[in-house]
From Swiss-Prot:
HAMAP family reported for this sequence: Ribosomal_bL36
Gene label: rpl36
Protein name from the UniProt record: Large ribosomal subunit protein bL36c
Domain of life: Eukaryota
Gene Ontology BP annotations: translation
Single Gene Ontology MF annotation: structural constituent of ribosome
Sequence similarity: Belongs to the bacterial ribosomal protein bL36 family.
Organism placement in taxonomy: Eukaryota, Viridiplantae, Chlorophyta, core chlorophytes, Trebouxiophyceae
Subcellular location, record wording: Plastid, Chloroplast
Major localization class: plastid
Amino acid sequence: MKVRPSVKKMCDKCRLIKRKGTLRVICQNPKHKQRQG
């Protein structure tokens, strides 16, 4: 899980989701998991 000030899609399978007020990226590739911090 990467914590970043700006989250971006890294590939076509990445999905941006807002969960409990934080932006998250979920993807089939675990390296692409991110959350805005």
